[in-house]
Amino acid sequence: MSTPTTNSVDTPLPGNGPSTPSSSPGGKEDGPEPCPGGADPDVPSTDGADSASVVVILDTAEEPERKRKKGPAPKMLGDELCQVCGDTASGFHYNVLSCEGCKGFFRRSVIRGGAGRYACRGGGTCQMDAFMRRKCQQCRLRKCKEAGMREQCVLSKEQIRKKKIRKQQQQQQQQSSPTGPGVSSSSPASGPGASPGGSDGGGQGSGEGEGVQLTAAQELMIQQLVAAQLQCNKRSFSDQPKVTPWPLGADPQSRDARQQRFAHFTELAIISVQEIVDFAKQVPGFLQLGREDQIALLKASTIEIMLLETARRYNHETECITFLKDFTYSKDDFHRAGLQVEFINPIFEFSRAMRRLGLDDAEYALLIAINIFSADRPNVQEPSRVEALQQPYVDALLSYTRIKRPQDQLRFPRMLMKLVSLRTLSSVHSEQVFALRLQDKKLPPLLSEIWDVHE
């Protein structure tokens, strides 16, 4: 990946990493899936509806980039629904796509301490929709939290007052500046934006990153990425019933059971690849690249994005990883599916390390976008253009982390260093796939193409 530049942090990212990994399923759903490696010799390949090529997937429903207009940040697709009540969402508030009503309700509940005053007459099991949200405040607040709204994102009255004062001071400085209104020179990433998460004060850092604000363009970018991920995840949920069931028979070592496990993980990998491609097409700037570069970037980054999403689904209490809605796997399950211990252990170690960082949806989305736009990937025709497209995401992540964790100056470089770790894992993945080839295992055409598995 090319080395992104910032004005304050000089953290080297991976240089010319290993050549594009060969293949091996890495599946995902809500995130990616694992990747079978040293699989059982007698397990046949799984060829099916997954025979689409990368080019075909890129061509499918390809949408031109939307023109951006000045003014309030528009919704990315126009049909997002509130994750609390199902009404039309107005934006990304307090870490969740939600409507204005639920945004205001959550803010008032936190500021006024509503959690202790609300009571449900139905035993706390009300199904929340646009009608019931007015009937049961307790269940509405519960649904807000279940959807992911965070109390720490809500600004207190005192914080709002200080924020208004700072904004007024900035406006006065801009008006008195000889260069006129513009971006403050005190911070390379500052600008007339809002704290992470929305202009309503729904930012992760409660606006405490002194001197740093997200620009309006950065705020819109983050909203677009998070909304795109949510939409792609939901699409993949619909494929869950089509996946070959995990064998639960009496003899887990039978040939049929091994075949089913291999097919199961391979099909999850295909869902993951399709989801990643769908997401990449919605990342601002990706479709501006030539077709050759789009394919080169996807081939090289897919396994790394799968591993990022795998870490995102890691549960430290159960030490399991969940894909799609409710497919949960332990280390033993990964091994039974055909992966080698040499690949399984690093996956779980990486997942634990990512959990310690505590990334939110916006940070994961930005990190994935940075990973996609890696100019040093093999066969990239216009590396300078790719690097230029990557830089705004690096700048946005830097500003976002400064606002969210202003006291943790090492958070941003730690996140970038995880991309270096992904290059190492990608190399281990290549060895995993080589084991498959030695055993004459054939992957479905899509996985063979995305990871350059040559017969």
From Swiss-Prot:
Locations listed in the record: Nucleus
Biased amino acid composition, Low complexity: 14-26, 168-193
Keyword DNA-binding assigned: yes
Region listing for Transactivation AF-1, in residue ranges: 1-80
BP GO terms, sorted: cell differentiation; cholesterol homeostasis; intracellular receptor signaling pathway; negative regulation of inflammatory response; negative regulation of response to endoplasmic reticulum stress; negative regulation of transcription by RNA polymerase II; phosphatidylcholine acyl-chain remodeling; positive regulation of cholesterol efflux
Alphabetical UniProt keywords: Activator, DNA-binding, Isopeptide bond, Metal-binding, Nucleus, Receptor, Transcription, Transcription regulation, Ubl conjugation, Zinc, Zinc-finger
Span list, region Transactivation AF-2: 214-455
Post-translational changes noted in the entry: Sumoylated by SUMO2 at Lys-404 and Lys-442 during the hepatic acute phase response, leading to promote interaction with GPS2 and prevent N-Cor corepressor complex dissociation.
Family that this chain belongs to: Belongs to the nuclear hormone receptor family. NR1 subfamily.
Name of this protein: Oxysterols receptor LXR-beta
Organism in which the protein naturally occurs: Bos taurus (Bovine)
Gene of this entry: NR1H2
